[in-house]
Amino acid sequence: MMNKDIEIRTMKIEDYTEVMALWKSIKGFRIRAVDDDFEHIKRFLDRNMGLSVVAVKNNQIVGTILSGHDGRQATFYHVCVDSKCRGENIAGKMVKEAIERVNAEGISKITLIAFKQNLAGNIFWKSQNWKQNKDINSYELVLNEENISSIVA
């Protein structure tokens, strides 16, 4: 998908180094030691082939969406745009493309987590007509104590 100088394309494992550099450049971005390492991102991409996307501008990755599903519903992870490229509707273009790909799989619902302190992200999702689900609490059970979260400062 091309729009001006932005290309939205499938994320490949060969993008990992550049994608990780982007994630590490975004203030407040949460990276997990195990889940976000090369091996686990490769496993995710292989399991959900063709669903994750990157935005490319001037031959540089400036946005990502990790997208996968379990057969019932999809989840978006690590939706981000380089802070220098915000305001260009890159996130909107990536979301549209990722939704089309999930829809083609016959999935009718997508969820995501937007951390409460991510004000820009929460404003974005509301502007895209996503509804905050106030009926649920989110829980997690850490099975690998080495899978610690770090937040980019």
Kindly give the residue locations of the regions a language model identified.
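Conserved acetyl-CoA-binding loop-helix of GNAT-fold acetyltransferases
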Residues: 81, 87-100, 127
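Conserved GNAT acetyl-CoA-binding A-motif
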Residues: 102-114
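A short beta-loop-alpha structural element at the N-terminal edge
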Residues: 6-19
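Conserved beta-strand in the GNAT
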Residues: 54, 60-68, 75-78
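Terminal substrate-recognition subdomain of acyl/acetyltransferases
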Residues: 127-131, 137-153
